[in-house]
């Protein structure tokens, strides 16, 4: 794991009307680090993840990915940067029901015009590593909850991003499948070198993460 920060944020403030959700957040996240973000509901965890993912902007503060100041990017540049560098996983798998799991995984690469001749070989390896190769031709309704979420993770990885941001990814899974999904994050990190930032209420995942950030009332604490 490199000590050089992949993500560096300083003084992040986010307001919604008169409500201050983030209050001067400073953080750095290293390459290949798995970071858990924990805290009570309403603490600002999802808002922080949205800002780190560049889908929302802070009212104050700065955000750098290595040497790139993402706050200075125009809308088109920012969209391109996000497609290439950031993957997202949510509590709901958000797989489109009319497409097969394989087609769902490919969508971000197709939309971002990032599909190459190596994509199929990469997916074959990825599906094999995740234990879902035999299920890739099925539609989401034919899959178990654990399988659906694994394909959602594969979709987040399709463009080989530097970082994967996950918001309660195991929140809808039973204990067994939640543990399988958490184990998968570490396997993928070790194989492909991604950084994972995971909002979670799961104490096992928080304890196993390389580092845990505690967010309360919009502030990071010990």
Regions found by a protein language model. Give the residues of each.
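ABC family nucleotide-binding domain
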Residues: 5-208, 212-215
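Short, Lys/Arg-enriched, disordered terminal segments
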Residues: 1-3
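Basic, Gly/Ser/Thr-rich N-terminal segments that form RNA-phosphate-binding interfaces in CRISPR RAMP
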Residues: 222
